[in-house]
Amino acid sequence: MLNPIVQKFQYGQHTVTLETGMMARQATAAVMVSMDDTAVFVTVVGQKKAKPGQGFFPLTVNYQERTYAAGRIPGSFFRREGRPSEGETLTSRLIDRPIRPLFPEGFVNEVQVIATVVSVNPQVNPDIVAMIGASAALALSGLPFNGPIGAARVGYLNDQYVLNPTSDELKESKLDLVVAGTKGAVLMVESEAELLSEDQMLGAVVFGHDQQQIVIDNINALVAEAGKPRWDWQPEAVNEALRSRITALAESRLSDAYRITEKQERYAQVDVIKSETSAALLAEDEALDAAEISDLLHALEKDVVRSRILRGEPRIDGREKDMIRGLDVRTGVLPRTHGSALFTRGETQALVTATLGTARDAQNLDELMGERTDNFLFHYNFPPYSVGETGMVGSPKRREIGHGRLAKRGVLAVMPKGDAFPYTVRVVSEITESNGSSSMASVCGASLALMDAGVPIKAAVAGIAMGLVKDENNFVVLSDILGDEDHLGDMDFKVAGSREGITALQMDIKIEGITREIMQVALNQAKGARLHILGVMEQAISGPRGDISQFAPRIHTIKISVDKIKDVIGKGGSVIRALTEETGTTIEIEDDGTVKIAATDGDKAKFAIRRIEEITAEIEVGRIYNGKVTRIVDFGAFVAIGGGKEGLVHISQIADKRVEKVTDYLQMGQEVPVKVLEVDRQGRVRLSIKEAGEQAQPEAEAVPAAPEAE
């Protein structure tokens, strides 16, 4: 019999239900989590034995959305879900980041977490639900997991923090922050903000962590009732004699190597020391394990770097704790791009371009939460040559997608609104060198490239990566961390913003005990670094250029009456296609009658505007037009009088005398003056050549006949 065990609780404005014991009973653990009709099914499978020689922790997190959750069938050719979307990849990373540091060092058994969205309420984003589910499933599994964790989304509306805002509330919020942590510590923060202060951001982190304690309490209650026995796993005992011998052989040499400021030279020297130490030890005792020697050397390397920083000595590259590496800022480096910049900070460098397009270039996203159009695209590329390596080049990996999204968050708050700047904008960051904080270099480069392209951003933005080294008695916050400091430190803390406030904040914390005081120090130190970088950037370009690039399309906007839209489009799009070909422009019409004409040539745009005005002009009864015969029928002739409008000249209105045969008087393509006699309620136009002939010269010039309108 199926005996589900259920835990239900109120979480802000939502009711959360945790259920286990019903499904996937062969998995190590499985939980169905629902939050107001958004339901995510999360499973955990852990292998009891580690693979021989496994040198890292093989944790895999897969988050997948099923279209049936929203009552839809996939729109792909095969009518089934395919490769993960960018959103699914980002949510997988969001789940992975806070749970990974909670597994003990030395645990290398394979673990897979799969979160499947099976029902979705468009007002409740599944990402928080999936994070809660992953935490609950891991806590139930018996794996050596030092959780559970809680997760919360925090908004900022009307100067108040809002717990887990709905999708509608989030559209009005100045903040979208996700925070995850254990009972006593914040582990992960991911956010974007509309220029909020350091205190407001820190307050949101603390608020979210306080509120999510109810999640942790309820997961613990579920584990008490349904949890599996804890795995009897213990880390392998450290060979103290070997560790002492390695310290004696390598400590002073590693300390000297970490005074070499150039990255490649330092890496080469460290590799030599490790190789020589390992060879010497194996020569002394062939029974020693090379992998164990490697692990102990890595631990020694970490201790050498950390202890120097904690003693207040200069960092690896000789800087003090709050110093920024040397900056080199250049704009307009690529002649034919719409905007470009080369941003260099020490050994980290980004070549960033900005490209302007029309609304047609925007990305249409058919997501589980509904369809949306994205007119600001940010793509981050990390080729292997940037770190002096060879490797595969192809589709973006999870890391590239995640870094691109973080950089996009850093710039999004200063981008102009669509009605003020009707362009689709694509920013691409090519990381050409990397030694720490390439995503924040991308933010700086993007700001520069956008200004170089003439995009009227509200303010310049810059990003900085902070680090932390902490022991029981002391802590040091580092500005502008190197790759080694990120790897060997206790926290990776990235902040982007303008002079006015923060636009993006990302935190990944590897240890417990990060207090509010430490986060406050890091945020304040990051502000000083950000302002320093902005000062250097402003020397290269102080604001957006006065005009967009000569190579970018210029978009001209006009307004037409809604009931004239069909005239401009024409039957089956015939009129708008003809206009596009005739004028050499791109024309887009919105439902409210807004017409956007894009052209690289101003004269072509003016011609297109004139033609649209002709098509949409009202026909005046009694006015004489110069028209062109487009069709001849037994009872008269149809004459185009401009702008795709056509009227009928009845056979009785061709001449003063009786007309037996229309073709005796009119030929196809013949230009004739016509007078408008009537426009009926259905828009049909009655014309007369006979009455026009009694007048003097035609009052309206002929225009080329356009395809028939609907």
From Swiss-Prot:
The keyword Ligase does not apply. PROSITE patterns: KH_TYPE_1, S1. GO terms for biological process: mRNA catabolic process; RNA processing. Its cofactor is Mg(2+). GO terms for cellular component: cytosol. Its EC number is 2.7.7.8. It catalyses: RNA(n+1) + phosphate = RNA(n) + a ribonucleoside 5'-diphosphate. Mg(2+) binds at residues 486, 492. Keywords: Cytoplasm, Magnesium, Metal-binding, Nucleotidyltransferase, RNA-binding, Transferase. Residues 690-710 are annotated as: Disordered. Residues 622-690 form the S1 motif domain. SMART domains: KH, S1. It is found in: Cytoplasm. It is an enzyme of class 2 (transferase). One of its GO terms (molecular function) is 3'-5'-RNA exonuclease activity. Involved in mRNA degradation. Catalyzes the phosphorolysis of single-stranded polyribonucleotides processively in the 3'- to 5'-direction. Belongs to the polyribonucleotide nucleotidyltransferase family. Residues 694-710 have a biased composition (Low complexity). Gene3D superfamilies: GHMP Kinase, N-terminal domain (3.30.230.70), K Homology domain, type 1 (3.30.1370.10), Nucleic acid-binding proteins (2.40.50.140). It holds the Pfam family RNase_PH. This is Polyribonucleotide nucleotidyltransferase.
